Swiss-Prot record:
This is Adenine deaminase 2. HAMAP family: Adenine_deamin (MF_01518). It comes from Shouchella clausii (strain KSM-K16). The gene is ade2. The keyword Thylakoid does not apply. Pfam families: Adenine_deam_C (PF13382), Amidohydro_1 (PF01979). The lineage of its organism: Bacteria, Bacillati, Bacillota, Bacilli, Bacillales.
Length: 573
């Protein structure tokens, strides 16, 4: 037998026996063709021989639940970053680009992925818009779903975010999509988003065809999901001692995998990707073989990627040579049998500019804002209003509602004389001109202002501030840049993060973007914003499926009841 490549003297992880076995590995036309002891493969001739020097060899890592746009980079940049972190296959859901450009945005992401080294499979965004209580640039319905199914890169239906409609509105758009997908594409998985659901509600979700959950987990919640036949996708925020101990102590190998979901650009550059979660699981005491399985074979099975996830005959030759035994530290990463990353060699990125259609760089259709745009008009000249207030807490993206007294003078809410800050959002697609104002408190900025078009999921212009002048300055900096994030204090832009592709992505190399993201976070933190992930906290203030009180261009949203509620609760003189 003659093959392209023969990897000699390695200890191969066998996903089926959970063992490392001293072997040689033959590869031809990008796939494994034989794995065995050197004397078993001695008749094989190869164009290239790689000396594995006794290193451990594991499959390329697979992440089946993530959003490229969370890193604010293009697929090309994302692929570059993934390879040095051992990830060779992903299933990405581009619901941010879908919210901005609809089906055109999804197709553009798929096209931008075509030349990437990493295999980028896609989930069809199922919740665009996430609710009917916001204005987005695009929408995905059954017709768009069917059109996308003609694309070979589609692997599943993306996370069903509006679980409230699934449970309580049989004729809702969400349920129509679910029923159509199950009937038309029964072999494909459906991803879920069901935080804290248990009991009958959870069983209704599973019965509707939703087969996984990637939200924050607890021991009790995991047990309930596994018993109901639901697959667990464990992201880093769920990797508590309690959760990991449950996974370690119980026979859960076939019921979970690790996923990243959202990774900020600075974290992607400095910390890594799925390998970060893998090493965290190891540190908690999970067996090395089980961690490998949770990052390779388990996700491949969940997504029915039967051609990968193991080093076995016929599988795609994606593999990693480990620099340290029993650790996710890589000396080399191979994709389709070809070297993609070598830790001993320079690894530089040369990104391509203007990878998207011209109008993707002109998506913010807002005129410059004025001070009057941030005036909150009351229905009386003077007095006191009881107002709903969004309360932000470090450690969570949930925002609690409180009701507080705020003075009114000359027909305007005097929020600047209170303990609260102003939050405002402006529809930026040129569709409705909608806008809304609210009050916000808690672990947020205490002075200055911040503005962003990176605001889940509608990506309208979101502004939070302690004074109107800085809010105007921050908003206009973002508008002028055609999208991004700006921090302003005393009329001076302290940090600017340009995101010109749809107002949510940058084409800069990761090495350039990551420090800008870090500077933005530092500037925001310097104004008093307290959160373990300030960008995620800020950007989800407009996410109307994340409890409990959020804001969109429709107004304040009571998430638990799925309805718009007024800022003013009642009046007192």
């Amino acid at each position: 037998m003659h093959v392209d490549t023969l990897v000699k003297n390695v200890r191969v992880y066998n996903a089926y026996t959970q063992q490392f076995i001293a072997s040689d590995v033959a590869i031809d036309e990008g796939r494994f063709v034989a794995i065995g002891h050197s004397d078993e493969l001695e008749s094989i001739q190869a164009n290239t021989i790689i000396d594995g020097q006794g290193q451990q060899m594991i499959p390329g890592l697979i992440d089946i639940h993530l959003h490229i746009e969370s890193s604010m980079v293009t697929p090309e940049t994302f692929s570059w970053a993934l390879l040095r972190n051992g990830v060779t296959t992903i299933v990405a859901e581009p619901h941010e680009m879908a919210n901005v450009f609809g089906i055109e945005g999804i197709k553009a992401m798929i096209e931008a992925s075509a030349a990437c080294t990493v295999d980028m499979k896609y989930a069809i965004p199922s919740s665009v818009p996430a609710t009917s209580l916001e204005t987005t640039g695009g929408a995905i319905g059954i017709a768009e779903m069917d059109e996308l199914m003609d694309t070979e890169d589609i692997q599943c239906l993306g996370e069903i975010m509006n679980y409230v409609d699934v449970l309580s509105k049989p004729d809702s758009k969400t349920n129509q999509i679910l029923k159509h997908f199950r009937r038309s594409y029964p072999a494909l998985p459906i991803e879920g988003h069901v935080p804290k659901l248990t009991g009958l509600d959870l069983h209704q979700i599973v019965a509707a065809g939703i087969g996984s959950d990637h939200t924050h987990q607890t021991r009790e919640g995991m047990e309930a999901r596994i018993k109901a036949g639901m697959f667990l996708e464990i992201q880093e925020k769920s990797m508590t001692d309690d959760v990991l101990s449950y996974l370690i102590e119980n026979d859960t190998r076939e019921h979970f995998c690790f996923v990243t979901d959202d990774v900020m650009a600075d974290s992607l550059y400095k910390r890594g990707h799925l390998n970060v979660l893998a090493n965290k699981a190891l540190a908690a005491g999970m067996k090395f073989e089980d961690v490998i399985y949770a990052c390779t074979m388990a996700p491949a099975k969940r997504m029915k990627l039967e051609d990968r996830g193991a080093i076995a005959p016929g599988k795609i030759a994606d593999f990693i040579l480990l620099a340290e035994d029993g650790q996710f530290v890589f000396s080399a990463v191979y994709k389709d049998g070809m070297l993609a990353f070598d830790a001993a060699s320079p690894y530089k990125q040369t990104p391509k500019p203007r990878q998207f259609p011209p109008h993707f760089y002109e998506s913010v259709k807002l005129a410059p804002l004025q001070e009057e745009d941030f005036h909150v008009v009351a229905d009386r000249q003077d007095g006191i209003h009881v107002c709903r207030v969004m309360n932000v807490a470090d450690g969570s993206t949930f925002t609690k509602e409180t009701q507080e007294r705020v003075p009114v003078a000359n027909g305007l809410l005097q929020w600047q004389d209170s303990d609260f800050r102003l939050i405002a959002t402006f529809e930026r697609y040129g569709k409705t001109g909608g806008r809304a104002h609210g009050l916000i408190a808690g672990d947020i900025l205490q002075r200055g202002a911040v503005a962003t078009t990176y605001s889940h999921d509608n990506h309208n212009l979101l502004v939070v501030g302690a004074n109107i002048l800085d809010m105007v300055c921050a908003a206009n900096a973002v508008i002028q840049a055609q999208g991004g994030c700006a921090v302003v204090e005393n009329g001076e832009v302290k940090a600017m993060l340009e995101l010109p592709v749809g107002g949510i992505l940058s084409e800069a190399p990761l090495a350039e973007l990551a420090p800008k993201v870090e500077s933005f976070v530092k500037a925001l933190t310097a104004l008093g914003y307290k959160h373990y992930n300030p960008i995620m906290s800020l950007s989800t203030l407009s996410l109307p499926v994340s409890p409990a009180l959020k804001i969109t261009d429709f107004g304040l949203i009571d998430v638990n009841n799925g309805q718009v509620v007024p800022l003013f609760v009642n009046e007192k003189s």
